Design a protein with these regions (language model features):
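Conserved nucleotide-binding and Mg2+-coordinating catalytic segments in signaling enzymes
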Residues: 30-50, 71-85, 93
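Signal-transducing coiled-coil linker helices
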Residues: 2-38, 47-57, 107-108, 120
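A short pre-motif secondary-structure segment
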Residues: 108-111, 151
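Active-site-proximal structural segments of metal-dependent nucleotidyl cyclase/transferase enzymes
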Residues: 51-83, 99, 110
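Alpha-helical scaffold within the catalytic cores of cyclic-nucleotide enzymes
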Residues: 96-97, 128-146, 176
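Heptad-repeat coiled-coil signal-transmission/dimerization helices
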Residues: 48, 52, 91-92, 96-99, ...
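Active-site-proximal alpha-helical element of nucleotidyl cyclase-like catalytic domains
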Residues: 87-108, 116
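Catalytic-core segments of nucleotide cyclases and related cyclic-nucleotide turnover enzymes
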Residues: 126, 130, 161-194
Length: 194
């Protein structure tokens, strides 16, 4: 009888452990889903804000350079209004694929909201940041969108280097102001904060 009870306990323990394991996997999957944008697969704004705070702490500790690059698709409302939201999604996905691919060795790409995206660069010098940003911008401008039967959708970018002691909000605002300057200067360009 004792052997039977032991076998029964082992069987239930195994089932319980499998259930806990399955629950943990589901929980981790849900946590990942909460951190990613469902359309693009990029990390979302919440993830960006958390990563930005961590980057500031790391940069303050190590003295390494860090940059924010904010991208915005130029005249995106016109794309949605003229070609429909599903084609607008095609445009967003195309840019996100480029952002993810070009930034993978230097930082992380995020969807900040709507047609606005961010790359958070770590331990990198400005010339390399500019190369990555300009590669994305140029490739996006030349990308052929079949639904339009041409290319020519552009994006603008604002870049800011982290300054020692700066808050996350101040750092982001400097990059955002640079983006605004790029838009004001005619779009399809990059402006670096001074």
């Amino acid at each position: 009888i004792l052997t039977f009870v032991t076998c029964l306990l082992n069987m239930h323990t195994k089932e319980l452990m499998e259930s806990i394991g399955n629950f943990t996997v589901r929980q981790m999957s849900l946590m990942t889903e909460l951190r990613k944008d469902p359309l693009t697969g990029l990390y979302n704004r919440r993830s960006f804000e958390e990563s930005l705070e961590k980057e500031i702490l790391q940069t303050e500790e190590t003295g390494e350079k860090a940059y924010i690059a904010i991208f915005d698709i130029d005249h995106f409302k016109n794309v949605n209004d003229t070609y429909g939201h599903s084609n607008g999604d095609v445009v967003i996905k195309a840019l996100c694929k480029m952002l993810k691919e070009k930034s993978k060795d230097y930082g992380l790409a995020f969807r900040y909201g709507g047609e606005e995206f961010v790359i958070l660069f770590s331990n990198i010098e400005l010339p390399k940041v500019i190369n990555v940003v300009e590669d994305v911008r140029t490739e996006f401008r030349c990308y052929y969108f079949q639904f339009m039967n041409n290319s020519g959708i552009t994006c603008s970018c604002g870049v800011a280097e982290y300054s020692k002691g700066e808050s996350a909000k101040a750092w982001f605002n400097r990059a955002d102001n640079s983006l605004y300057q790029a838009k004001e200067a005619g779009r399809n360009r990059t402006v670096v904060s001074e």
